[in-house]
Design a protein with these regions (language model features):
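P-loop NTP-binding core
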Residues: 1-203
Length: 205
């Protein structure tokens, strides 16, 4: 059964999509079968893999709402060994449309649990907020990888995210583990970068 890694941080501009793209591509290059799922309405991971996010018929939005089959949503071999479930701005409406659905936190889990048999890794690029899409990702994931910038406010956001992860683990997904943090835009010449890195060494990969 494949591992499902959610790349998450509710703060924008910390390198989530870049981390998700590079992690997916590196695993694929090592011969692992990888599925990247773009859960951000901005669609940066989709664009990053060279897919026209405005020119695709079926995306994660249609899949979550039951308007498309999984097989019709997956873009095959965007890179060798790497498939993609794309996203675009339509996904921003999913939050409202999922409100009245029972067990809405488990919709993505129902999809990814079936896909785990086909892939070694499923990488979830989460949106920059702790909304229902991120809760779906954390409920589906086996672990969480958190990209953070080495700045003061990033630490504040990490505390909030860890609290959310703990709540999801307690109530929705007991298997969820903290994979670690990845320091992005790290500059070893600055004291702040060094202080942040030392403070969170116990969480890093």
């Amino acid at each position: 059964m494949g591992r499902i890694i959610a790349v998450a941080n509710q703060k924008g501009g910390v390198g989530k999509s870049t981390t998700a793209i590079n992690l997916s591509a590196c695993l694929a290059e090592k011969g692992k079968k990888v599925l990247a799922i773009d859960m951000d309405p901005q669609g940066n991971t989709t664009s990053g893999f060279g897919v026209d996010k405005n020119g695709i018929e079926n995306t994660l939005y249609e899949l979550l709402l039951g308007e498309a089959e999984t097989k019709d949503t997956i873009v095959k071999d965007v890179v060798e060994n790497l498939d993609l479930i794309p996203s675009n701005i339509n996904l921003s409406g999913a939050e409202i449309e999922l409100v009245g659905i029972d067990d809405k936190e488990f919709i993505l889990k129902g999809i990814t649990d079936k896909l785990r048999r086909k892939y070694d890794y499923i990488i979830l690029d989460c949106p920059p907020s702790l909304n229902m899409l991120t809760i779906n990702a954390l409920t589906a994931a086996t672990s969480v990888l958190v990209p953070i910038q080495c700045e003061y406010y990033a630490l504040e956001g990490l505390s909030q995210l860890i609290h959310t992860i703990d709540l999801v683990k307690e109530r929705l997904n007991k298997r969820l583990k903290m994979e670690g943090v990845v320091f992005t835009m790290y500059d070893a010449r600055t004291n702040l970068s060094l202080q942040v890195a030392v403070s969170y060494t116990h969480l890093t990969l």
